């Protein structure tokens, strides 16, 4: 599409070299601004997910609005629909449990990075009692996510409580919500979703 070509040109012309490691001949690239970052991530997502019915960038904006408004049930439905729209042949090379888990990690890392263009995002945030899968912060809400592959949403929610992932937000004036999400390796989408206001 024209917007994708425009994003590609913008990215090619705007990525900057942040560091160079001469021993390993490796470059660390960075984005000069959020617009270039958004264009790059949207282009990668469109290629990786190959959604059939909607544009990735539109879905991301809609998802962020739902999170900004505290509409977690609608966000869960949107996430489930998005994952269900990824063509089955995108998952074709997945043969083992480990590969399935890696596939979900990559998929959600990319989705979360896209959301992070619009709100504050912490992926695999290390805390004193463990590493929380994801914390998304908006102006009025803090969402603490724990993901389980072929587990239960209740187990994910219990981990948030047991590891006290919400402790850093005890004095935060925003509404803090713990969300446990279970994904199915069979359906490749959301299986269960449980949340609790903390």
For each of these PLM feature ranges, what is it?
Residues 1-6, 10:
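Single conserved hydrophobic/aromatic residue that forms the stacking wall/gate
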Residues 33-89:
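Leucine-rich, amphipathic alpha-helical/linker segments
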Residues 86-121:
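Acidic-basic catalytic patches of nuclease active cores, encompassing PD-(D/E)XK
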Residues 108, 132-149, 163:
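Conserved catalytic cores of phosphodiester-cleaving nucleases, focusing on short active-site segments
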Residues 115-139:
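Active-site metal-binding core of divalent-cation-utilizing nuclease and nuclease-like domains
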Residues 168, 172-198:
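Domain-level recognition of nuclease-like catalytic cores that cleave nucleotide substrates
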């Amino acid at each position: 599409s024209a917007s994708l070509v425009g994003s590609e040109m913008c990215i090619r012309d705007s990525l900057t070299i942040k560091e160079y490691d001469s021993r390993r001949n490796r470059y660390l690239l960075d984005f000069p601004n959020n617009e270039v970052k958004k264009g790059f991530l949207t282009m990668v997502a469109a290629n990786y997910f190959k959604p059939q019915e909607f544009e990735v960038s539109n879905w991301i904006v809609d998802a962020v609005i739902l999170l900004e408004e505290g509409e977690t049930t609608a966000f869960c439905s949107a996430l489930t629909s998005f994952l269900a729209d990824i063509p089955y042949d995108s998952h074709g090379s997945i043969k083992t449990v480990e590969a399935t888990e890696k596939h979900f990690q990559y998929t959600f890392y990319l989705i979360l990075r896209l959301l992070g263009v619009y709100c504050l995002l912490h992926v695999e945030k290390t805390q004193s009692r463990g590493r929380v899968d994801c914390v998304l912060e908006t102006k009025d809400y803090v969402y603490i996510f724990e993901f389980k592959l072929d587990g239960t949403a209740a187990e994910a929610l219990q981990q948030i409580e047991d590891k006290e992932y919400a402790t850093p937000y005890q004095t935060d004036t925003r509404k803090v919500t713990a969300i446990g999400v279970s994904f199915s390796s069979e359906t490749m989408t959301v299986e269960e979703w449980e949340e609790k206001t903390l």
